[in-house]
A protein has these predicted regions:
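A structural-propensity feature for long, helix-poor, extended segments
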Residues: 1-43, 112, 120-124
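Conserved mixed alpha/beta core segments that line enzyme active sites in large multi-domain catalysts
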Residues: 33-297
Length: 297
C-alpha cells in the first residue's frame, strides 16, 4: 500500500479524493496523475517477460476484514497486454492500476462505507497483477472452465449435507460466474447426483461465454469500465474452438434424453459430464478436498 500513499501524496489527490466530487471527476484526476518512476520501471521490466493477458485486481485493507464483506466493492480490470508497442502496453497497465486505486471512491464504494459505519480515509489500496489463466483461440482468450465453490450449502437436498458444500461452473472467464448468469451447480462430494431434470437443465444451461477480445485495439478502460476488453460469444464459437467436448451434453429430442454424441442434432447443455460424471480431470475430488481443508482453517 506504500505506492498508493505515494500516489495520493505526490499528486496532491487527497483534496479531490476525499471530497464530495463525483467519481468521474476523481477518476479523471487519478488517470492524469503519475505513478512513481520506480514503479514504472518495475512494470516495464515485468512486461518484458509477461506477454499474456493480465488481471489488475484490488487488494484493499478492508478486503481482509473479518466483520464486513468487501467482495465486489472495488474494480478488477482485464487487459489483453498484446500490443506490439511496449510503451502502449505499459501505459495501459498503468491506467488499469490508477483505475483500481480510484475505485475506492466510486459512488457505490462510498455508499458502502457509510452503510457499515467505516471511514473511507482509513482504506489503503494495494494492487495485484496476475496472468489470466487461459489460452488463445482465434483472437479470443479464455479458460475452458471457471467457477466458485463454498464450503457450506444453505440449500441441500437429497442426502447432501450442508457441510458438503457446493460449486458452480461455467465456460470462459469467471466474470460470467460472479455476474449471476446461468451456471452449472453441483456438490463436489457427490458430483454424479443430478440436481435438476432434463427440462430444468436446458432452461438453466449456459448460452454464451465471456472471453478477452484480443483483436479489439480500440477498447477504453476509462470509458467502458471493467468489461472494456471482454466480449460475449455464443456456444457455437466455443464448440468450433474444440472446447465443448468434455463440458457439455446434447439433448436428443427424438428420444427425449441426453447423449454425449455431438453428431446428434440438438441443444447443447453445459453440464460438464466427462469431468463430473467420468473424472476426465479430478475436479470434483480436488474441490472436495480443498473445501474440507478451508473449512477447518
Amino acid at each position: 500500500v506504500d505506492e498508493f500513499d505515494h500516489f495520493i501524496d505526490n499528486n496532491n489527490l487527497s483534496e479531490i479524493a476525499y471530497s464530495d466530487k463525483s467519481y468521474e471527476e476523481i477518476k479523471e484526476a487519478f488517470i492524469q496523475a503519475e505513478l512513481t518512476p520506480c514503479l514504472k520501471e518495475k512494470l516495464r521490466n515485468y512486461l518484458e517477460v509477461m506477454k499474456k493477458p493480465l488481471a489488475v485486481r484490488s487488494s484493499g485493507l478492508f478486503e481482509d476484514s473479518l466483520s464486513q464483506p468487501f467482495a465486489g466493492v472495488y474494480s478488477t480490470y482485464l487487459i489483453p497486454n498484446n500490443d506490439a508497442d511496449m510503451v502502449r502496453r505499459a501505459l495501459e497497465l498503468e491506467k488499469a492500476i490508477k483505475l483500481v486505486f480510484s475505485s475506492i471512491f466510486t459512488e457505490g464504494s462510498r455508499a458502502y462505507f457509510r452503510a457499515i459505519g467505516s471511514m473511507i480515509e482509513e482504506e489503503k489500496m494495494a494492487v495485484i497483477i496476475q496472468e489470466v489463466v487461459g489460452n488463445e483461440y482465434d483472437g479470443k482468450y479464455y479458460p475452458n472452465i471457471s467457477g466458485v465453490a463454498q464450503s457450506y450449502n444453505f440449500y441441500p437436498f437429497s442426502y447432501i449435507k450442508p457441510e458438503d458444500g457446493f460449486a458452480v461452473l461455467a465456460l470462459g472467464l469467471g466474470a460470467y460466474v460472479v455476474g449471476g448468469e446461468k451456471t452449472y451447480r453441483f456438490c463436489p462430494r457427490y458430483p454424479r447426483l443430478h440436481l435438476a431434470s432434463i427440462q430444468d437443465m436446458m432452461r438453466a444451461s449456459q448460452q454464451y461465454f465471456y472471453a478477452i477480445d484480443l483483436k479489439n485495439k480500440a477498447y477504453n478502460l476509462e470509458h467502458d469500465g471493467e468489461d472494456a476488453a471482454i466480449k460475449a460469444y455464443d456456444l457455437k464459437t466455443i464448440e468450433e474452438d474444440g472446447n465443448l467436448t468434455h463440458c457439455a451434453s446434447v439433448y436428443d429430442f427424438m428420444n427425449d434424453n441426453i447423449t454425449y454424441d455431438f453428431n446428434v442434432m440438438g441443444a447443447r447443455i453445459v453440464n460438464f459430464p466427462n469431468i463430473l460424471q467420468y473424472d476426465y480431470i479430478p475436479l470434483a475430488s480436488t474441490l472436495d478436498t480443498l473445501l474440507d481443508i478451508f473449512s477447518q482453517a
